[in-house]
């Protein structure tokens, strides 16, 4: 058998710890979201855009010719927080509009129009905040460039996905829940219509 040691072993251990910590953080995040929403599905809708942010970060590394390393992973962790925040803002406003009496399709359209500007501003301020680091060419800054690329370009890609994915998944969930309720009512009506056997 063989194994890496020295300088190779430390990053491998750190990467394993980062992945385990990230999985725990996602579980805690899901729990914290499920409690106020009172739903097991809506937190998954909020977190569904996180993998797309990762895709944007990976492609940005390929486009810029930057190796994907440990600091890139740190950028993905920060990216997850921004993506979840944007999705949460959108879905919470959809629920508020729906609870005010609007049909779900109108609530989704209204939320997408009203919350588009805040979500876009959050994305642009995050990207512009790390952009000077992305274009910095000094030797001292090269250490942090992969993290800035992951966060900056990942949030740009994820925002586009959020504005399409979250409304679509919310509508699918609403339709599925409506069909489930109709079937339940039909079963209940059939059960009550059957004559009781003495």
Residue ranges and their predicted role:
Residues 1-176, 198:
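C-terminal transmembrane helical bundles of large multi-pass transporters
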Residues 172, 176-187:
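Short helical patches
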Residues 183, 187-198:
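Long, low-complexity, intrinsically disordered cytosolic termini of multi-pass membrane proteins
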């Amino acid at each position: 058998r063989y194994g890496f040691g020295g300088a190779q072993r430390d990053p491998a251990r750190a990467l394993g710890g980062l992945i385990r910590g990230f999985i725990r953080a996602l579980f805690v995040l899901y729990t914290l979201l499920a409690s106020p929403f009172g739903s097991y599905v809506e937190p998954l809708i909020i977190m569904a855009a996180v993998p797309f942010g990762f895709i944007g970060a990976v492609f940005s590394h390929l486009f810029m010719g930057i190796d994907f390393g440990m600091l890139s992973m740190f950028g993905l962790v920060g990216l997850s927080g921004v993506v979840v925040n944007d999705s949460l803002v959108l879905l919470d406003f959809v629920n508020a509009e729906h609870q005010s009496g609007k049909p779900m399709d109108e609530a989704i359209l209204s939320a997408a129009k009203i919350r588009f500007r805040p979500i876009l501003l959050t994305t642009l301020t995050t990207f512009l905040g790390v952009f000077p680091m992305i274009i910095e060419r000094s030797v001292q800054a090269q250490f942090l460039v992969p993290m800035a690329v992951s966060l900056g370009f990942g949030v740009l890609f994820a925002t586009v996905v959020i504005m399409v994915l979250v409304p679509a998944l919310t509508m699918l969930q609403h339709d599925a829940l409506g069909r489930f309720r109709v079937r339940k009512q039909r079963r209940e009506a059939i059960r009550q219509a059957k004559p009781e056997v003495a």
